[in-house]
């Protein structure tokens, strides 16, 4: 495995969605690690130290906003960029995410492979700039 591969943690309660993200981003050289739900996701972020987190909002054990708040409250996680990937497609949800919570990007399901890839590359480019 190349050392310069960007590591992405995908926190999602649907294994099929994790597999889809792994397929899309894996083809472009990203290393994707999946977490089934928020609690597992936080533990995985702590262990893996990813370059980026893809975060679902609606999960049964701990919702995405709670995961995001815990990340931003921790010194070792607060600088990791977060892209929300959710079925919550109403404009108010997007405004809350991008302008109130200040997530790095907000993608609604269903999404196209190119949309996901462009978002990930844009956010990572902004962080490394």
Model feature map: region roles:
Residues 12:
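Conserved acidic carboxylate
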Residues 19-27:
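Charged docking surfaces used in two-component/phosphorelay signaling
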Residues 22, 66, 89-106, 118:
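Alpha4 helix (beta4-alpha4-beta5 surface) of REC/receiver domains from two-component response regulators
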Residues 34-43, 64:
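Helix N-cap/capping motif at the beta->alpha junctions
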Residues 48-54:
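Active-site beta3 strand of CheY-like receiver
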Residues 59:
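Receiver (REC) domain active-site loop signature in two-component systems and cognate sites
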Residues 110-121, 128:
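C-terminal output helix
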């Amino acid at each position: 495995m190349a050392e310069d591969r960007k590591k992405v943690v995908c926190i999602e309660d649907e294994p099929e969605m994790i597999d889809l993200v792994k397929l899309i981003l894996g083809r472009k050289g990203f290393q994707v690690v999946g977490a089934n739900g928020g609690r597992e996701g936080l533990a995985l972020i702590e262990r893996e130290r990813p370059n980026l987190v893809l975060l679902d909002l609606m999960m049964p054990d701990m919702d995405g906003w709670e995961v995001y708040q815990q990340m931003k409250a921790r010194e070792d996680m607060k600088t990791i960029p977060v892209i929300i990937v959710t079925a919550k497609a109403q404009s108010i949800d997007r405004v809350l995410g991008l302008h109130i919570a200040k997530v790095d990007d907000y993608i609604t399901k269903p999404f196209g492979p190119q949309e996901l890839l462009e978002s990930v590359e844009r956010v990572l480019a902004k962080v490394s700039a």
